[in-house]
């Protein structure tokens, strides 16, 4: 898979993982595990990129005597998810056309 495409997919997956509630690194990895395997280093690179792009915010809170970073999706992050859905609806339409053409030639 193209590196840029994979990056975009992973960014949206991380945004989707925090869409309904604030979350922290380990929980994001755990929530995504049934769908995609993600290392901690990759996740934190993505989180930093999304924060820089104003798609999420970060707050620090104490949990069990330790500081933990919690991530919250922003309006811009929600917009990215909606844009992604629209893009993929178009891609699926093209895919169906290609598959139809293949099956017509069989």
Q: PLM features: residue spans?
A:
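N-terminal helix-turn-helix DNA-binding core of bacterial DNA-binding proteins
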Residues: 2-42
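Short, motif-level signal for alpha-helix interfacial/capping segments enriched in acidic residues
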Residues: 17, 52-53
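Beta-hairpin "wing" of winged helix-turn-helix
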Residues: 53-67, 72
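Amphipathic alpha-helical dimerization/coiled-coil segments
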Residues: 82-106
């Amino acid at each position: 898979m193209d590196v840029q495409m994979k990056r975009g997919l992973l960014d949206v997956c991380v945004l989707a993982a925090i869409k309904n509630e604030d979350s922290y690194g380990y929980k994001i990895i755990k929530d995504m595990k049934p769908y995609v395997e993600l290392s901690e280093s990759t996740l934190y690179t993505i989180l930093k990129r999304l924060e820089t792009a104003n798609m999420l915010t970060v707050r620090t809170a104490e949990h069990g005597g330790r500081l933990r970073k919690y991530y919250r999706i922003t309006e811009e992050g929600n917009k990215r998810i909606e844009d992604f859905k629209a893009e993929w609806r178009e891609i699926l339409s093209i895919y169906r056309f290609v598959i139809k053409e293949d099956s017509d030639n069989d």
